[in-house]
């Protein structure tokens, strides 16, 4: 009789927390296994199969391995691990001859790691987070406390944005990750937030490659968009119908439009720089216009729900990568808006862990 642990009830609190504590280091193992799985296209191979249920040998035969038989034995262990972490389901059947056949298929969790109909997924963000350039920064995390240094700067000698400008591989990895995450987030935002309706022109300040505007305009094709970012950023931006890429510096000035979008910009900067950005937006805004800020938000008191865990994790990322970058509370955002001259601050929607804030003069 096969051993199953699903019916084991652990009621001893000390045992529960000890097992949870022992599982903490496994977070690193999971991320590195997922990195390998993505690089080998394991999830995409399963997704593209006609049955969406494949054995380890069937998967191994579709990856560039020299020996599928030997590789399938290693792969079987990896697939079992991913199934134990809810990224796959395991299906075991026995034919009339008593031969056991094991196959694996995707779960809702692993669906986020395969490309959707628009070609976006969370996979590029995981590859960015597990890249040696990013990982090396975490080895200097304690220096943020001991020496007041930025871990990324300590590891690489330059600011993260400066590093991306010099390393084309890392810059491409970063841009792909941000484009995919932004696409996923913005598709949900345009579903739950109707504040773009009736708007004629939008400028996306710090818009990167323009994916936020492209997603908005796909739903509201009458909108004309300006994607505003540094010249070296927009030079790689693709052409989108209805979008003009304009080079500039948001710390100097922002072009005037009736709606100014700031998505995941303020969390990159300290309070002083944030106020400078917001003041430039205030100056560029017509009297009846609005600034739409999209950011993660910290609760006033630490909470253990998924939204809070996500924002707290990203706050640690900001601490590691950027000088002054951080996730903020509602009150902290409101204080920044007031300092910049805005009189109306409204939280109007939430998509996943992103909050949509409207600012008015």
Swiss-Prot record:
Homodimer. SUPFAM superfamilies: S-adenosyl-L-methionine-dependent methyltransferases, Winged helix' DNA-binding domain. Coiled coil: none annotated. This is Myricetin 3-O-methyltransferase 3. Pathway: Flavonoid metabolism. Flavonoid 3-O-methyltransferase involved in the biosynthesis of polymethoxylated flavonoids natural products such as myricetin derivatives, aroma compounds possessing antioxidant properties and exhibiting pharmacological activities such as anti-carcinogen, anti-viral, anti-thrombotic, anti-diabetic, anti-atherosclerotic, and anti-inflammatory effects. Catalyzes S-adenosylmethionine-dependent regioselective 3-O-methylation of flavonoids; active on various hydroxylated flavonoid substrates. The active site is at 267 (proton acceptor). Disulfide bonds: none annotated. InterPro entries: COMT-like (IPR016461), O_MeTrfase_dom (IPR001077), Plant_O-MeTrfase_dimerisation (IPR012967), SAM-dependent_MTases_sf (IPR029063), WH-like_DNA-bd_sf (IPR036388), WH_DNA-bd_sf (IPR036390). The keyword Transferase applies. Belongs to the class I-like SAM-binding methyltransferase superfamily. Cation-independent O-methyltransferase family. Mainly expressed in leaves secreting glandular trichomes types 1 and 4 and, to a lesser extent, in storage trichomes type 6. GO terms for molecular function: kaempferol 3-O-methyltransferase activity; O-methyltransferase activity; protein dimerization activity; quercetin 3-O-methyltransferase activity. It catalyses: kaempferol + S-adenosyl-L-methionine = 3-O-methylkaempferol + S-adenosyl-L-homocysteine + H(+); quercetin + S-adenosyl-L-methionine = 3',4',5,7-tetrahydroxy-3-methoxyflavone + S-adenosyl-L-homocysteine + H(+); myricetin + S-adenosyl-L-methionine = 3-O-methylmyricetin + S-adenosyl-L-homocysteine + H(+); kaempferide + S-adenosyl-L-methionine = 3,4'-O-dimethylkaempferol + S-adenosyl-L-homocysteine + H(+). One of its GO terms (biological process) is methylation.
